[in-house]
Amino acid sequence: VRTNSAASSRDGGGERLVRQSAVVQRVWLPGVAVAVAVAAGAAIASTEQLSERALPGALAHAAIGYYTRPTHDLVAGLARRVEAGELTLAFDETTGYLRPILDALAVPVASQMLVMSKTGVQGLHTDPSNPRAIYFNDEVTVGYIRGAPLLEFAVQDPEQGVVFYALDQKPQARPLFDRRRGCLTCHQAYTTLHVPGMLARSVFMTPDGLALGQFGSYDPDDRTPFERRWGGWYVTGTHGSMRHMGNAMFKSGDDRESAISERTLNRTSLDGLFDGRGYPSAHSDIVALMVFQHQARITNLVTRVGWEARVAAQEGRADVTAGPLRDAVHELVDALLFTGEAPLTSPVRGTSGFAEMFAASGPSDSRGRSLRQLDLERRLQRYPCSYTIYSAAFRALPDAVRAAIYARMREILSGRDRSAQYERLSDADRRSIIEILSETLLDFPRM
């Protein structure tokens, strides 16, 4: 997929670090596909407002420079280390560079999620017998398909949004990470809020891995009803009486429920569904899937708010207290506080150990409380404020924007705003969130 027609990123020493492919190709995050119209009821009104407001010309705007400014993401940093000879990536005949890259980027194997559907440029290599594996941490997502020619990366740059790379799965003295320009054909769309972002579709999938178009599809996040999640994905974990679309395969003429059964629900193992040799984990953990979908939504919102603010400042209209920028800030705050989250009606338990690993990664306050602690009985997080508030991208938001975010959070968490959409935030929730943030987020104002 590499091309000789390429531009190179350069550091201060002028050495080539990451080649930027000039050819437009449909390379996207594994398991993540083109934004499509969401079936009735799946869209959320507030996000529709942002989605309807495009940002024409933003990629090339002087305040953004998506393809021209230096990148400061984890994959670019890894590329620099490999190019400088500071890090050697060992090649394995089965998994290629996957394991050393996961180690170098601190991406846990326990985060593995498996996609059965034929989405992405390497769709010919993907079906229920050879799923696409996705691994992630707070900043980077790595995609691997057994026997496919590429590893794929989607990584959040603190200012640029999600940046896409690919790596050839063949032995090389110094593997070269290609920055992929064509990914934005699908990864800058209505569903990503018109910024380079993340997508995670839920489809009605046929036994050969194709999406059955007659039923439409969903672009789920933490607000999406459980029963509309994970179509086209393998799912391991228990979830009581709740139903989901994972592990199910539909045929033309089926109704929406016909393929969902005891065989597809509450699976603690994928034994008998496909040959798992060549994958680092035997799981496609339900808790990892829930966390990933929440994180994808926040990733897009943080990028959108940052881009709106930087473009507005460049054009001399950076008032965060009124107009579109204020609305974008309010949407981000609502997402951080899990406003509109679909409630859980049964306990959820994963199988890979991801939940325990995630919850233990902090930071914690003096009472041992953390925004990474999971509830999984009524909702995703024990304390309903997103851990993504600690991310490098959030910290990179303009100071005035972060101040506006904190001011809006104060209105809600102090109880001054008791609008109906925040009624699921109990007084104890609000107090705990304030206390945790006051100790663990340095610039969070004391209340």
Language-model features: locations:
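Conserved small-residue
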Residues: E48-Q122, P131-D138, P225-E227, G232, ...
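Short, structured secondary-structure elements
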Residues: V75, A110-V115, G120-P131, I145-V155, ...
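Bacterial N-terminal signal peptides that target proteins for export
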Residues: L17-V32
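Boundary at the C-terminal end of the N-terminal hydrophobic targeting segment
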Residues: A42-T47
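Sequence context surrounding c-type heme c attachment/ligation sites in exported
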Residues: N137, G143-T339, L380-M447
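Acidic, glycine-enriched catalytic cores built around paired aspartates
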Residues: T339, G350-E377, A393-F394
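Serine residues within intrinsically disordered or low-complexity segments
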Residues: S5-S9, S21
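Bacterial N-terminal signal peptides
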Residues: P30-G41
